């Protein structure tokens, strides 16, 4: 079984209880055989333990189609995802999210916190979730109730 999981924070970056709950849930799920765990958070910091899951930064998922060459994508996405992953996600944008401000790659910036514009960030997170839901292969989606 494949589960696509969404959270808002992940250790060691704890802002409330959600990160701790996400860690326990993913750690327990990872003990199941043949259960890959892609776990989406708005902004990874790079020091999260990914030994039992794959963290996907919502800030690296394109939501607006931008025509960029391979080398540019490789340089900008280094350490986040491969150019092939980027193009696969970009080619699975099914809705017009051009109302959302994006960077040159069509990705949305996230604070990685609980900012004053939290509702806007949640709306942008929905756009990322839509792209991932169309692009990735999974059997079930897990998301906390307020996401």
Regions found by a protein language model. Give the residues of each.
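Extreme N-terminal starter segment of soluble prokaryotic enzymes
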Residues: 1-3
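Short beta-strand segments
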Residues: 7, 39-41, 142
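A short, glycine/small-residue-rich beta-strand->loop->alpha-helix junction that serves as a flexible
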Residues: 9-21, 47-50, 118-120
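Short amphipathic alpha-helix
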Residues: 19-30
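A conserved catalytic-core segment of Leloir-type glycosyltransferases
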Residues: 34-133
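Short His-centered aromatic/hydrophobic patch
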Residues: 122, 143-147
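Glycine-rich phosphate-binding loop signature in dinucleotide/nucleotide-binding domains
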Residues: 134-138
């Amino acid at each position: 079984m494949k589960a696509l999981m969404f959270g808002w924070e992940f250790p060691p970056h704890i802002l409330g209880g959600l990160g701790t709950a996400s860690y326990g849930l993913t750690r327990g799920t990872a003990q199941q055989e043949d259960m890959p765990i892609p776990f989406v958070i708005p902004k990874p910091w790079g020091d999260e333990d990914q030994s039992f899951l794959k963290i996907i930064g919502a800030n690296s998922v394109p939501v607006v189609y931008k025509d960029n060459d391979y080398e540019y994508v490789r340089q900008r996405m280094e350490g986040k995802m491969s150019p092939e992953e980027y193009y696969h996600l970009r080619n699975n944008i099914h809705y017009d999210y051009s109302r959302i401000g994006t960077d040159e790659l069509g990705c949305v910036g996230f604070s990685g916190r609980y900012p004053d514009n939290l509702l806007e960030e949640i709306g942008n997170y929905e756009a990322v979730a839509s792209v991932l839901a169309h692009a990735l292969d999974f059997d079930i989606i897990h998301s906390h109730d307020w996401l």
